């Protein structure tokens, strides 16, 4: 006998197939006059009709990544409350945090996220998202799949979602990298190669790759020339570096596409280093009162940096709590206490980011 899940999968496939075969009015929308006209017309094949895409409603995307995976019943999907106690049998564990009200009637989340609860009316809560079973050994496999849409391993490097957005939409501000990755160290990590596998532009070329800033409070150091270096010397170094790239293995044996992409990425970096917009990376310029609202750790500072970069014209920013095996949200040990600490780190900064974007008129386009 098929299981409930098998039945739902079959029903979903059948429904999608039926929708895909519907009249041409779907191409332009149910209520679109042109779509209705096309639907009523018997002339012309469906293959000749132009797809009408919805208009973009956002300029910037900020992805806040809870690396390691927060437990849904302890955060945004509370179940029956069971107070935590040492030695609690696993079969009795439902939600060890009580449910609290939010700004939306009949929507509750778990205690410890009080600030986020007050801004829930600015967003959409999805509790039905399901991922494929890629094995339980490495979180990196699931992170790779979520960020790229591909199941690892791949014979070619698959682009990160940020690289797709950078490639398709391009930069909003020519001086600000289109894809900025905040908070994740790729070295000194037990799964560094797995992480590197999807923190990449893949087959799009290096110019669309992430501008990595593992430590938000040091971001400004990555976008300004070394102290004391004159503009003339900086320009001379840049020219010399381009010559060295030509003599490198990439320059000697890489394809023309790879070489040109590398040179364009260098040009982008040079443009940023000489731009006044680089001050957006300097958290020391943030007023103390504002900075303190975000200063819960690297993630909170990353949220502040994301807001400043959004104001400066960034296209895609990912801020992560950082994935390290068995640390942070990867709560294999002392799970309840660790979840308490992680909520303290993310609750205020996430809520403040939403409020700040709203106050600046940016929330509707972010």
Where are these regions (language model features)?
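Ligand-binding pockets and gating/stacking loops
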Residues: 1-366
């Amino acid at each position: 006998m098929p299981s409930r899940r098998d039945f739902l999968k079959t029903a979903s496939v059948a429904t999608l197939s039926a929708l895909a075969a519907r009249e041409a009015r779907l191409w332009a929308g149910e209520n679109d006059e042109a779509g209705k006209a096309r639907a009523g017309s018997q002339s012309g094949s469906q293959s000749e009709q132009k797809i009408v895409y919805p208009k973009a409603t956002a300029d910037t995307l900020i992805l806040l990544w809870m690396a390691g995976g927060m437990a849904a019943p302890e955060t945004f999907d509370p179940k029956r409350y069971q107070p935590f106690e040492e030695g609690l049998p696993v079969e009795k564990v439902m939600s060890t945090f009580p449910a609290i009200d939010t700004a939306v009637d009949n929507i509750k989340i778990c205690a410890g996220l009080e600030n986020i609860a007050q801004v829930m009316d600015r967003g959409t809560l999805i509790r039905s998202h399901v991922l494929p079973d890629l094995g339980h050994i490495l979180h990196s496999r699931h992170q790779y799949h979520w960020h790229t849409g591909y199941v690892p391993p791949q014979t070619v490097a698959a682009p990160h979602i940020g690289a797709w957005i950078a490639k398709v939409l391009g930069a909003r501000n020519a001086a600000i990298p289109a894809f900025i990755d905040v908070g994740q160290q790729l070295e000194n990590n037990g799964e560094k190669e797995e992480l590197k596998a999807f923190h990449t532009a893949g087959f799009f070329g290096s110019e669309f790759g992430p501008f990595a800033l593992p430590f938000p409070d040091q971001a400004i150091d990555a976008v300004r020339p070394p102290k004391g270096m004159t503009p003339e010397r900086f320009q001379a170094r840049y020219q010399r570096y381009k010559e060295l790239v030509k003599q490198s293995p990439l320059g000697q044996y890489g394809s023309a596409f790879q070489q040109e992409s590398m040179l364009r990425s260098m040009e982008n970096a040079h443009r940023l280093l000489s731009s006044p917009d680089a001050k957006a990376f300097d958290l020391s310029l943030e007023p103390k009162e504002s900075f303190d609202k975000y200063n819960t750790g690297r993630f909170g500072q990353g949220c502040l940096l994301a807001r400043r970069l959004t104001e400066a014209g960034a296209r895609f920013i990912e801020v992560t709590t950082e994935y390290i095996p068995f640390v942070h949200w990867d709560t294999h040990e002392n799970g309840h206490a660790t979840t308490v600490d992680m909520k303290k780190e993310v609750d205020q900064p996430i809520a403040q980011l939403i409020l700040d974007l709203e106050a600046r008129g940016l929330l509707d386009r972010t």
